[in-house]
Every structure is written in C-alpha cells, then in structure tokens.
C-alpha cells in the first residue's frame, strides 16, 4: 500500500518466488567427488533474474520499455538512480546512450566491492579495491577514465549493485526493427584486444551460467558478453566515438553500499580518495594485481588445454564423478566431443597424478 501511494499512476508488477516457485529440478546439477549432486549457485541466481524479467522476455507485457534497472540489496538514493538511467554518456541531443551502465558498490565507505563481475576494457579484473580501483595493465583505459573524472568509464563488464540496461535487449520483438549490422573493430596497437564473437546472441537476452563443474563465471558478467555479441542498435549516435568503447560503462558518481553507515560516510571518503592513487599503484605492482587469468584472451571456438588433478585411486563415487565430468565437458552451449576425437590428449592413467583435457571455448555462445 505504501508503494502504491508513493507511485500514483505508475504501472507496477511484483514477481515473487512465493507466488511462482523456481523448480530446482530444471536447473543444471554438478556431481561432487563424493557423488553428491548440487545446484550451482550462479545458475540459480541466473534463473532468479530471468524469472523477474519473464513478463518482458516472454512478450506478456506489450509496452516497450526504454531502460531496465537492476538493484541488489543495497542502500541507494533516487538521485543516483536517475543519474545512472538518464545522465550517463549523454549525447548532443541530451539523451543518455549506453548498452549497459553500472554504479559502484562499496563494502565500506572507501573499499570497492564488486570484484567478481567487474572487468576493464581489456578484460582484466580490478586491482586493489581502493580508488581508482582498476589496475595498470595493458592500455589502462578504465583506470585513466576514472582518473579523468568521467561519468562514463569504459569497461568490459560490471554490476556494482545497481545497473541499467538498454531495455531493448530484454524485449521480444525489438530486434526485427532496430538492429543493424555490427561494426567491425580492428585491434590496433594492442596485444590485449578481444575479438567480437562471430555468433550473434538472439534477443531477448537471458541471464545464464557457466556450465563447467568447477569453474564459475558470474551471470552478471556473462550478460555483458552476450550484449557484446549482439549488433548495435541503429539509433545509437555516439558509437562511432572512441569514448564509446563497447558501449558498457561504469558511472563512479553513482555509489551504493550494503549498510546505512557506509552510505553515510561515502561523501566524506570521496573528498580524499584521490590520495589513494599512488599507493594503489604501488600495492598493485608488488601484489601482482590484476591477477593473471589464462582465459582472458580466449575466443569462441578456441581449443585450449586444462590441467586436472587426478588422485592415484578412486572410490566408485569418485570414478563416476570423473566420468560425468568428462561426459558433460564442453558445456551447456557447445560440445567438445568433435575436438576430443581429433586430438586425443590427456588420456587418464591411474598412475598419473596430473593430466590434461581439451575443451572448446563456448563462453559467449548461446543455444
């Protein structure tokens, strides 16, 4: 009732798990070495987010929505949310243009929180989570944007507790009339540039999880990968500018926290946070941050080798778990079986402790 009173004339609908229970039996399960099966946390979270979007993605709601805003269990203010939605990367006509834009969430007034889903323009994870948050690897574009005081810091992905998307990515009939051919991007003066996926994601997009048993990628990160595999909408006007990047931004002026005390003190921390800059760079250097990620440069369809610890003996449950692991390897959105036949590598031997296995990169692919 209080919500209705404060939002007169605004259409609203609440999707609650108590009314529409998620069927856990439909979710992908992994088998642990003990033989016990578990639902992967990220797959569950992806399903929850898809459930919230279902009225839009299913076509049940016929109205067209310009923006979709996700909020975690955070303390925020309306001014910040409005700034994120309508005041980020504003074009000459005064309209905000982005594929996605996130705020910045903090676990304390000075410590950045979202290290899991945040990646800079070249796919590096962040450095020490104090201002300016990003590390100095590669071209350091994201770090430079923060230091330049931009409200549209170019990134590869982020979430930050509050994130807004171009609503067309989640609406069923939009693609037929508003998408155009994706522009070609050439890698220039850098050995650390991602290639755009050759397989285009279909609209409406849905959140998903990484199907491998013992590797997780955040659903908040994978949704950005799928956005990047989607052609640009034809009415973007700033996507030819260098400042556009991939069209995914962080707005560091929009900040949220997970408790009221931290939110209260953020305004004070912002006054002196630039003093952290040299110290953050020094700590990044000696702590070797961002950490090395052997998957950062993988492209869809690449064949790569993983190393897997194999004990000298197996219980029947462990043996079955290993069989299931190899059988399901290749993922929910692809199949590595053809590659395995072409290159028999890492055949398991009871006398070996470490073996290899082959997989096909499918992290951007969709069914």
Provide a role label for each language-model segment.
Residues 2-66, 71:
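Active-site-proximal specificity loops/subdomain of glycosyltransferases
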Residues 42-49, 65, 78-81, 167, ...:
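Generic preference for well-ordered alpha-helical elements
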Residues 35-47, 149-152, 156-159, 211-218, ...:
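Intrinsic disorder
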Residues 40, 73-204, 273-321, 325, ...:
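Conserved catalytic core of nucleotide-sugar-dependent glycosyltransferases
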Residues 19-27, 108-111, 256-258:
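A short acidic, often aromatic-flanked loop/helix-cap motif at beta-alpha or helix-coil junctions
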Residues 192-194, 199, 205-221, 225-367:
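Terminal low-complexity segments of carbohydrate-biosynthetic enzymes
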Residues 7, 55-64, 87-96, 229-243:
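Alpha-helix termini
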């Amino acid at each position: 009732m209080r919500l209705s009173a404060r939002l007169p004339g605004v259409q609203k609908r609440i999707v609650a798990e108590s009314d529409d229970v998620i069927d856990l039996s439909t979710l992908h399960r992994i088998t642990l070495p003990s033989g016990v099966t578990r639902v992967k946390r990220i797959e569950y979270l992806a399903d929850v987010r898809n459930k919230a979007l279902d009225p839009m993605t299913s076509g049940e709601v016929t109205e067209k929505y310009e923006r979709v805003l996700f909020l975690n269990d955070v303390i925020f203010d309306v001014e910040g949310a409005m700034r994120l939605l309508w005041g980020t990367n504003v074009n000459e006509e005064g309209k905000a243009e982005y594929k996605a834009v996130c705020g910045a969430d903090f676990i304390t007034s000075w410590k950045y929180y979202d290290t899991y889903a945040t990646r800079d323009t070249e796919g590096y994870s962040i450095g020490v989570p104090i201002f300016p948050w990003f590390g100095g690897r590669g071209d350091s574009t994201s770090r430079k944007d923060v230091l330049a005081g931009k409200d549209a810091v170019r990134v590869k992905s982020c979430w930050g507790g509050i994130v807004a998307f171009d609503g067309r990515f989640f609406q069923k009939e939009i693609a037929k009339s508003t998408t155009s051919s994706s522009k070609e991007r050439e890698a220039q003066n850098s050995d650390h540039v991602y290639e755009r996926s050759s397989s285009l994601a279909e609209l409406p997009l849905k959140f998903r999880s990484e199907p491998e048993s013992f590797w997780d990628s955040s659903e908040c990160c994978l949704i950005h990968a799928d956005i990047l595999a989607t052609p640009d909408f034809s009415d973007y006007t700033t996507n030819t500018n260098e400042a556009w990047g991939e069209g995914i931004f962080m707005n560091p002026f929009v900040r949220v926290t997970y408790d009221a005390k931290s939110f209260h003190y953020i305004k004070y921390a912002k006054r002196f946070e630039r003093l952290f800059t040299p110290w953050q760079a020094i700590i990044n250097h000696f702590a070797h941050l961002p950490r090395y990620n052997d998957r950062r440069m993988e492209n869809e369809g690449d064949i790569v080798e993983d190393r897997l610890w194999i004990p000298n003996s197996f219980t029947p449950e462990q043996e079955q778990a290993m069989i299931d692991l190899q059988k399901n390897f290749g993922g929910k959105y692809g199949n590595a079986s053809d590659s395995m036949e072409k290159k028999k590598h890492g055949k398991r031997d009871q006398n070996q402790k470490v073996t290899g296995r082959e997989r096909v990169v499918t992290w951007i692919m969709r069914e």
